[in-house]
């Protein structure tokens, strides 16, 4: 699992409620302004955390947005 500091712009976010054995947080789509190769990341950010978890890295905003909505759909089905 890769951990990154969250000091970039959050473009989209969707809350994820706490459940048995899980914490509340949000699924995020992040733009890393200092990265040229894969500037867009989707991941999960726990409430109060300063780092995201389970990041998927993308070179285009379109692909990152698709992954963001797929993560949101997966989380909705889990609830």
Q: Which residues are covered by each model-predicted region?
A:
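A short, charged, amphipathic alpha-helix used as a generic interaction element across diverse proteins
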Residues: 53, 57-75
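Short intrinsically disordered terminal tails
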Residues: 1-2, 74-79
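Short aromatic-glycine-(Arg/Gly/Cys) micro-motifs in beta-strand/loop hairpins
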Residues: 26-55, 71
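Negatively charged, low-complexity tracts enriched in Asp/Glu with abundant Ser/Thr
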Residues: 1-21
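Positively charged, low-complexity intrinsically disordered regions
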Residues: 13-14, 24-27, 78
């Amino acid at each position: 699992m890769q951990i990154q500091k969250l000091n970039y712009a959050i473009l989209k976010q969707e809350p994820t409620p706490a459940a048995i054995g899980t914490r509340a947080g949000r699924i995020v789509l992040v733009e890393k302004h200092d990265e040229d190769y894969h500037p867009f990341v989707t991941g999960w950010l726990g409430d109060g955390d300063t780092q995201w978890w389970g990041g998927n890295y993308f070179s285009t905003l379109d692909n990152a947005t698709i992954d963001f909505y797929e993560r949101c759909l997966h989380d909705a089905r889990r609830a």
